[in-house]
Structure formats: structure tokens, C-alpha cells
């Protein structure tokens, strides 16, 4: 089942895969990593001017990693803005997805957090470095195959 945006993308020859609708009726699309930056720019020009959220998750142990973008088309005088969910999947080994920081500045910290927790490298992100874990931390804590270290540092509460 295709929504309005998916039909528009097909009409303009833009490669994607419709994943249907979520429980709120929001259209969900899958975009290939190599197509993501150009489609992000097109979506911004089309009117999706607000990146509501970005997150990432590990699809399955040993499987793909996903970066998820919730975009909103905010227009003056519209009570119910149009929304879309974009999923970009990346291989577990050397996962790379183009950053959309230069399209939506609000992608800055969420992409850094996704990098820090899952190891997804966002190409052309200006400050991609660990944001929650220490720089010396080894591994990606939110991956399903992550093995927690056998040590815990007890710090003085004062």
C-alpha cells in the first residue's frame, strides 16, 4: 500500500520501498544509504522542514542496523501536519549512512548518539564523536551482540 509521498517519489523516479503505515497512520519508507542524502534534500525542498526525531536500533543479532528519521511538513494554517518515517538500513560491518546534519541541523546530537551507542558512521557529520560514553570505551553498547565488560568502576559519591 502506497501513501501520498511514496506515490510522489515513484512519479519522480526516486528509488525507495514503501513499508506501509504505522499505528498512527504515518507512512514509513525505506531508503538505501546511497540514495538517502539526495532524497533528504528533496524531502526538505518538498516541505519536510522539521526533523522531529532521529534514532537508531539493532534489527537483529548479527543483522542490519537501522537509522530512523521522523519528518514533519510544517505549514502555516495547517492543523494536522503531514508526517513521514524514513528507515535507512546499514550493514553491521562498517555501517555508513550519509549525515543529514546539513539538511536538518537538529540531526546533530541524535546522529552522534546513534554513532556512540551503535557504531553507525554518519558520513560528512561535522562533529561525529562519542557523546555519552568515554572516548576510551570499546564497543557499541546498544548492539544486541555487545558483551558488557566484566568490571564496574565504583566512584566516590562526593
Swiss-Prot record:
Function per UniProt: NDH shuttles electrons from NAD(P)H:plastoquinone, via FMN and iron-sulfur (Fe-S) centers, to quinones in the photosynthetic chain and possibly in a chloroplast respiratory chain. The immediate electron acceptor for the enzyme in this species is believed to be plastoquinone. Couples the redox reaction to proton translocation, and thus conserves the redox energy in a proton gradient.
Enzyme class: translocase
Family: Belongs to the complex I 30 kDa subunit family.
Example of a GO cellular component annotation carried by this entry: chloroplast thylakoid membrane
Annotated keywords: Chloroplast, Membrane, NAD, NADP, Plastid, Plastoquinone, Quinone, Thylakoid, Translocase, Transport
Enzyme Commission number, as recorded: 7.1.1.-
Disulfide cross-links: none
Catalytic activity, reaction form: a plastoquinone + NADH + (n+1) H(+)(in) = a plastoquinol + NAD(+) + n H(+)(out); a plastoquinone + NADPH + (n+1) H(+)(in) = a plastoquinol + NADP(+) + n H(+)(out)
Localization, UniProt: Plastid, Chloroplast thylakoid membrane
Gene Ontology MF term list: NADH dehydrogenase (ubiquinone) activity; quinone binding
Name of the protein in question: NAD(P)H-quinone oxidoreductase subunit J, chloroplastic
Keyword Zinc: no
Main location: plastid
Subunit description: NDH is composed of at least 16 different subunits, 5 of which are encoded in the nucleus.
Organism: Cucumis sativus (Cucumber)
Gene from which this protein is expressed: ndhJ
Membrane topology qualifier: Peripheral membrane protein
One GO process term, biological-process aspect: photosynthesis, light reaction
Taxonomic superkingdom: Eukaryota
